[in-house]
């Protein structure tokens, strides 16, 4: 396996029907099997080629994590082109700069980045619709790529400075992934939850390429809120997680809250004390109830991007989860060292991975080389020469040392870059330049300063007038990206900043002095909170405000409706996600984090919560009819009872069975509803391969208003209740759960029985199910040539009627198709049979 093309091709051959990429965007899981990837990627490459992409071109990939990101990434590689991934949080200015530097031909974007992507002035392919477009395209042969072919250019996250693009080849990425396959306990039965941005090489290599080389599955959550993540863990039985330290703390905090809410703190701490003295299997047994909240399969968490909190890591280790930490750099493809489960020393970043060499320079800098090392920076020979020495060693700019046991320890950054707890990187020079654009600033220095468990961007200013401090910070933040926002500031009291003999600012001296100054950012209440209006609150204070205040560590009386979550209350991107998770836990209301703007006000958050109160997620499984015993009984009833009964009253002819292939499902079958026995006719005449995996959506208000009738329907027809009015979300979740298990769905789009016809207008929900189901829709028409006495129910009538069951060709609806349009097209397809 030498190239990304090989990953897809060999994966399809080796792992075939195993699920590769999974996501549940609405009521049903969309899954791409390994064979699907092998078939879809060459077709998606055709779509990109027809949009103007050729061998050697660059394509900007600016989209959120989802399976289609991987499809686009591999399709670009298939053409011999290079991906240029951008973080969804990057600014338009940054995107323009990268597009200009690389001469990109195209941008692949998602709906979350639509506004920014359009500003680049390049042709756009929408990532959500790429698989649909690929399905209609012919596959294209792969370009003659080799391990040395450029696969992608990954740019630093600096916004106001000149970003550098690290050039990574196919061989760099494959070498790092295959080396990590020897380090991480990863296999075909594992499922990894992808939460870190795929634009970051750590997630891309360890969270996408590596799993696909070993036959594992990658699950994409629809939100990063802790409550949603935990539900995703549970629903998909996730076993491996890659995360940044702050994200780990969010999950840990969610567990701690549940412990306190259940009043089990003393018991919880006793279990931890016992766990320190027993082997891993017993640890997992002690914390079985906690781990079951995560699906019961979680065994490994890999942490990267910034320093791991040893106390938090210890808590997870005591629960029987291996806590592994890595160190690396984009320029090394990216992993340099990683701890091993059998040699895991918390507080270190482990040993060099196979094939990578590491040495410590005389000044303490970490130097590395190996097959993952990049070739250089895009069109920047000066920066390349500064990073790679004559002997081929990459100079990381980081300081470290080896322990006597050969473990690498990270001691800080030689270069002036801040690693925030959410994994984002901020170059101090970029923020300083934004501050210095203001003529009122004589000089500025930016440092990372502790606030709670992580670092915040803190500005130290030399001003003639300290009264303008807040104005200067606010103006600079308008020019900075969300992750670069200045969270605290200090006016330097001396005439000048401390400097070296060469007049460089001495930031260690600044950090030491900040301890004694009046407004350090390390105060328990964020400095920015002082800007919030402090008004007395009465007993009717909104509970959302109380939750916000608790997370921001401020008095609720200090939180005004006009306070901005980011700039006033210092909540970074992951803290805003945590906020929505706490709101869901405490109020039962789910708010999609995509709906919350980075700098939304408290009032806007409250409005979002109120708007979402009527959209609470339903629960319920109705799983008992799916048990093998019940299904065997049901199929027996169909063969021994339903078939002869239907045959007594109707002669049934069937056409179109060639359109049904059990391997291409699950299908959604949409017949007209014109006879009392139409359910029996369909159930008894469909092929057994389809029927044994068939579930019927039955009207909850008619079939399930009688207990005996509902039980019989569930046993014989594998029916489940579908609400025609209200409670729709729960019904859709029941429908989706069956499709996720491979069941075909029989649903009557008219919504009611009209004996003898004519065909009634289809309900609007039919289009929603057809589009969001993401599966082939099979139109079916029951043609009545002569009605039986059982349906006509009057004399004189024939005892035995004559009907024809016509099965049409499957129809696919593209993601994004208007639901009303889909309903109209589906109705027309049934009428035309």
Predicted segments, located by residue:
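Conserved pre-ATP/AMP-binding loop-to-beta segment of ANL
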Residues: 17-19, 138-155, 162, 185-191
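Conserved AMP-binding/adenylate-forming core of the ANL superfamily
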Residues: 21-52, 57-66, 70-74, 91-96, ...
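Conserved AMP-binding A3 loop
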Residues: 31-35, 151-177
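AMP-binding/adenylate-forming catalytic core of the ANL superfamily
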Residues: 107, 360, 370, 375-376, ...
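Conserved C-terminal "lid"/linker of ANL adenylate-forming enzymes
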Residues: 445-448, 477-532
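A cross-family acyltransferase "interaction/gating" segment
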Residues: 656, 692, 708-711, 740-744, ...
